[in-house]
Amino acid sequence: MVWNKPNNNKPDFDPWGNKDSKSKNCSDNKHEKKTTVLDIKNFLYNLKNIITKKTDSSNSSKKITYPFSIIIFISFFIWGVSGFYTITEAERGVVTSFGKFSHLVQPGLNWRPVFFNEVKPVNVETVRELATSGIMLTADENVVRVEMNVQYKITNPADYLFSVCYPDDSLRQATDSALRGVIGHSTMDRVLTEGRTLVRSDTQKEIENTIKPYKMGITILDVNFQTARPPEEVKAAFDDAIAARENREQYVREAEAYSNEVKPKANGKAQRILEEAKSYSSRIILQAQGEVARFSKILPEYRIAKKITLKRLYIESMERLLRKNKKIFIDTNNNPMFFFSLDNFFSKIKIPNKNFKDHIKINKNHSPFNKKVKNTNYFPFLSPDNISEQRRINSIRSDLKKIGRE
């Protein structure tokens, strides 16, 4: 305690030390030893207090800095983890550093420093469509309504994002301008009928030439020319014209099909006629040569027996001429008004399957015309019922003879 501390050789203020001053003075040596021991204790005590104060101050500073370090570590961890991102297979990432284009990233897991870099994924595989339509003026000063669909995709993401502010709107304006230019240089019939394919290809070329200087990062895949129709006021007349044109095309196709069907037949028939003509020519030539040879053989006989040869030639000629003609037999000894057809006569007689000449030779003695017999009817096929009809026919025949004589 403080009263136990010595103070510049001053008397000791220990309350227990004044009880017996004599005893204190008597034992000075003993008190000197105790004072030395107390000084060591005081020194150790004071050192302990100093150390204790320093320890308390360091602990208080540690208590202040430890939570702040944890907060900083967690913040850095969250910042680092939040920088990871994924780009899909159909996309490409456009990285900007403080708003300026930096580079492109490929599909997969990537990392960026948050708050410093930004990533904008752009789909480069999807085919996008842009539809446009409108009423336009043609080259022949007609009005037509046209609808068109444009298919495109992004091939350069950086140009698509940074070259033009609104690339889709710019493409729409370029499409409208190109379509109006092509329609303005085409006639209405061409737009509505056979010129649709040409209008489509010309429009695609015009769109590509328009967007090329702007480097929009877009590639035109296809242009579909959907519909083109006239105004409603004249639609009926144009429908009739289109129907007539389609009918004409149908008739042309039918004519071509008929031509393809008839031509082979005609060619075959012509070839057959040529072959028949050649064979006929050969046959006639051979027949003429045969006649010449026959007359050459007959000539010596003609010189020997002129009358007989002439009569034989006459009979053969008449036989050849009358073989296929209708023949009428007339009996000049009786009434000339009665006549009958030899064809009808021989059709009633059963002639065997032999030559007609042989049949006549065999039956010439049995012919009813060889003998004149009274009350013999030479025309058994004529009945009394048809005599009047036969007379009418004979009168017509007589009239014909008179007309021939006149």
Curated annotation (Swiss-Prot):
Segments of skewed composition (Basic and acidic residues): 11-29
CDD domains: SPFH_HflK (cd03404)
Claim: Membrane is one of the keywords in the record: yes
Family, per entry: Belongs to the band 7/mec-2 family. HflK subfamily.
Region (Disordered): 1-29
InterPro entries registered for this protein in UniProt: Band7/mec-2_domain (IPR050710), Band_7 (IPR001107), Band_7/SPFH_dom_sf (IPR036013), HflK (IPR010201)
Protein origin, superkingdom: Bacteria
Compartments, record wording: Membrane
Keyword Cell membrane found: no
Function: HflC and HflK could encode or regulate a protease.
Descriptive protein name: Protein HflK
Topology term for the membrane: Single-pass membrane protein
Subunit relationships: HflC and HflK may interact to form a multimeric complex.
Keywords of the record: Membrane, Transmembrane, Transmembrane helix
NCBIfam families, A to Z: hflK
A GO CC annotation given for this chain: membrane
Residue ranges with Low complexity bias: 1-10
Gene symbol of the encoding locus: hflK
Residue stretches spanning the membrane: 67-87
